[in-house]
């Protein structure tokens, strides 16, 4: 981008009555040499920008990986940085623990899960949860014209809801408006309401320095074996629906909404919206219908396996 994000400076403050370097709060300060309008997002949430010749922004970050997005006009720059967890004096550093989906979702370890619906099960007996990613204060990625990913997601999710209902499925949405259900509340609800499968809808964007024309692809993610076969079946059809977008296949990634051990779950990244062509395609209701029909066909293939 032309007006690059110059700095993302971490400033740590000592806990009360402690000496440096013990910390309990970490803040990020950014600056850019421009007098144009900027927007700054920290972990998907817009934060206040204070004008100080260029600008100054301050927001609390959390231990682990954080994402800082700087948006100016049609340009978006994304920087990721890590913050160490404050340690007690004399404490040895310990590696981070892997996610425990049972603990995360409050599922008993001895819980018995329903099998995948048998081939020939009437669609009306199959419960599908459709999740429109992001929402509320979490906007997700931004398109060149400033449209937010959360809005692309809800449009595609509602289109999918209609397509599933036309095929006879029972459908539940995690959100139908500009709300933000907490990430773990989405899969928890799928468990609580005994869903047979869970589909999360997202749209992608390149990170800092990335070329969206080179990076542009569609992909469907799963986080465990239970979801991977579903992801593969869906991605085969989605890839054809969004041609000539490159097919990145079905991939495994640890995602909060997909680590559900009880319900087969996957996350579909339809297209790259920070590319004008991807933005235009994702805003096209005809293309949305094609993607929705593709996901339905993928689900039907998976059920027949």
Language model feature labels by segment:
Residues 2-305:
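Catalytic-site microenvironment of enzymes
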């Amino acid at each position: 981008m032309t007006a690059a994000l110059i700095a993302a400076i971490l400033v740590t403050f000592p806990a009360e009555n402690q000496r440096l370097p013990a910390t309990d709060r970490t803040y990020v300060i950014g600056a850019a040499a421009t007098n144009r309008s900027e927007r700054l997002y920290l972990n998907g949430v817009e934060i206040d920008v204070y004008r100080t010749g260029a600008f100054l922004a301050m927001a609390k970050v959390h231990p682990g990986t954080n994402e800082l997005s700087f948006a100016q006009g049609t340009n978006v720059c994304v920087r990721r940085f890590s913050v160490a967890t404050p340690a007690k004096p004399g404490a040895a550093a310990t590696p981070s623990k892997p996610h425990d989906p049972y603990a995360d979702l409050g599922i008993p370890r001895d819980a018995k899960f329903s099998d995948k619906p048998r081939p020939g099960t009437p669609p009306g007996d199959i419960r599908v949860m459709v999740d429109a990613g992001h929402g509320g204060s979490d906007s997700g990625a931004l398109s060149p014209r400033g449209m937010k990913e959360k809005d692309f997601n809800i449009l595609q999710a509602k289109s999918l809801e209609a397509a599933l209902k036309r095929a006879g499925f029972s459908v539940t949405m995690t959100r139908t408006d500009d709300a933000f259900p907490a990430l773990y509340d989405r899969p928890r609800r799928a468990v609580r309401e005994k869903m047979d499968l869970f589909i999360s809808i997202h749209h992608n964007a390149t990170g800092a320095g990335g070329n969206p024309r080179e990076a542009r692809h569609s992909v469907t993610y799963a986080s465990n074996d239970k979801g991977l076969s579903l992801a593969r079946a869906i991605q085969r059809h989605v890839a054809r629906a969004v041609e000539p977008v490159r097919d990145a296949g079905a991939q495994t990634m640890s995602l909060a909404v997909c680590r559900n051990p009880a319900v087969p779950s996957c996350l579909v990244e339809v297209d790259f919206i920070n590319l004008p062509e991807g933005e235009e395609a994702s805003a096209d209701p005809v293309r949305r219908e094609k993607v929705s029909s593709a996901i339905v066909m993928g689900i039907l293939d998976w059920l027949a396996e």
